[in-house]
């Protein structure tokens, strides 16, 4: 029977890990006792195989951290890798077997009104109302809005909400019920995720935004883009953010003229986003043709689903992470994966 993690982090001096055991979801907080290695006549060697090492065990993460702080620069310390990866290496010594059908993937997209001052709705300000959200989970679609709408497909459900607070509350409740291991969508890392967390924090409360995490915590961070610009995003602890545009760039090894969802869907699926050119902008579409506006929101989510049905990039990413014995998001980078591979070999 398969037992494997989907996300493992260090938090509050413990290892927080979630995953599946024989298809059943588990969540554990582990009081981890790490080890380090020192030069000595022991049974271990460094990666070159030339330096003999002896193992030194500690009673807690804090004790090991204090030891490193005290003796760094005094003598060589080996095996100083982040503790979540050491825990994974010790818990899964052999090859990790997983079942991708277990892994809960929540694919979503939000729409917003125009800000009161006009212009683009920036995620860090989140000063425009969220007026529609669609979630795709396990090939079922759930759309939240405040107007009247009739679903066009049997696997689509529309949830009419009283107002924006009701919409966001119901969205978070469904998210929590699904308990996703992975979230995806198009440009969600730098738009949808920071926007929705900042908006929930602003009009409901930061505590309610924390409900998006199975560990009850979302953490704001600024990330430098390729052009050196800093953008806000969030770590939703326990949930892997696998933005599909990012993994598309990482794993397809082709250069596209544009990485908009419209262009990539056309290149890969010979299909485009829903056309609303008869209306000046999305706000006018929302005001004048609500049915088409919701169709547009659903279509964006459908396109991401169909892209992965064709390309299977999420499964490729899972496979790579389990080969390396790291977290899913680590595979999007490079250095962390190699650090973990070196540690395990």
Task: Label each PLM-derived region with a short phrase.
Residues 97-117, 212-234, 343-345:
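Extended, Lys/Arg-enriched charged tracts that mediate electrostatic binding to polyanionic substrates
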Residues 279-345:
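Common nucleic-acid-contacting/processivity interface regions adjacent to the catalytic cores
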Residues 3-10, 14-46, 88, 92-182:
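Conserved RNase H-like, two-metal-ion catalytic cores of nucleic-acid enzymes
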Residues 115-116, 190-195:
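Short catalytic/ligand-binding loop motif for oxyanion handling, primarily in non-cytosolic enzymes
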Residues 122-124, 194-207, 335-337:
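Short secondary-structure boundary/capping segments
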Residues 48-103, 157:
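Extended acidic/polar, glycine-enriched regions
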Residues 143-144, 151-158, 162, 179, ...:
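Active-site-proximal helix-loop-helix substrate-binding element of RNase H-like nuclease domains
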């Amino acid at each position: 029977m398969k037992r494997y993690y989907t996300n493992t982090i260090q938090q509050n001096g413990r290892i927080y890990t979630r995953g599946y055991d024989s298809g059943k979801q588990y969540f554990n907080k582990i009081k981890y006792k790490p080890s380090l290695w020192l030069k000595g006549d022991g049974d271990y060697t460094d990666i070159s195989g030339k330096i003999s090492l002896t193992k030194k065990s500690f009673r807690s993460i804090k004790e090991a951290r204090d030891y490193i702080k005290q003796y760094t620069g005094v003598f060589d310390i080996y095996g100083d890798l982040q503790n979540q990866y050491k825990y994974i290496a010790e818990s899964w010594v052999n090859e990790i077997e997983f079942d991708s059908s277990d892994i809960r993937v929540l694919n979503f997209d939000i729409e917003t009104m125009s800000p009161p001052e006009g212009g683009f709705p920036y995620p860090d300000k989140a000063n425009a109302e969220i007026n529609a959200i669609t979630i795709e989970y396990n090939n079922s679609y759930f759309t939240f809005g405040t107007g009247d709408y009739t679903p066009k497909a049997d696997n689509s459900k529309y949830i009419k909400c009283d107002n924006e607070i009701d919409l966001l509350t119901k969205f978070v409740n469904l998210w929590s019920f699904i308990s996703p291991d992975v979230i995806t969508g198009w440009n969600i890392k730098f738009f949808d995720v920071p926007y929705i967390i900042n908006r929930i924090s602003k009009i409901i409360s930061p505590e309610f935004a924390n409900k998006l995490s199975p560990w009850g915590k979302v953490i704001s961070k600024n990330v430098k883009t390729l052009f050196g610009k800093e953008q806000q995003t969030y770590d939703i602890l326990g949930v892997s953010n696998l933005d599909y545009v990012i993994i598309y760039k990482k794993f397809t090894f082709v250069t596209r003229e544009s990485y908009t969802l419209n262009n990539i869907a056309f290149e890969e699926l010979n299909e485009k986003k829903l056309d609303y050119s008869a209306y000046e902008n999305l706000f006018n579409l929302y005001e004048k043709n609500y049915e088409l506006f919701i169709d547009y929101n659903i279509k964006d989510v459908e396109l991401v689903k169909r892209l992965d049905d064709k390309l299977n990039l999420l499964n490729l990413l899972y496979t790579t992470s389990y080969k390396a014995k790291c977290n899913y998001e680590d595979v999007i980078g490079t250095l962390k994966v190699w650090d973990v591979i070196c540690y395990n070999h």
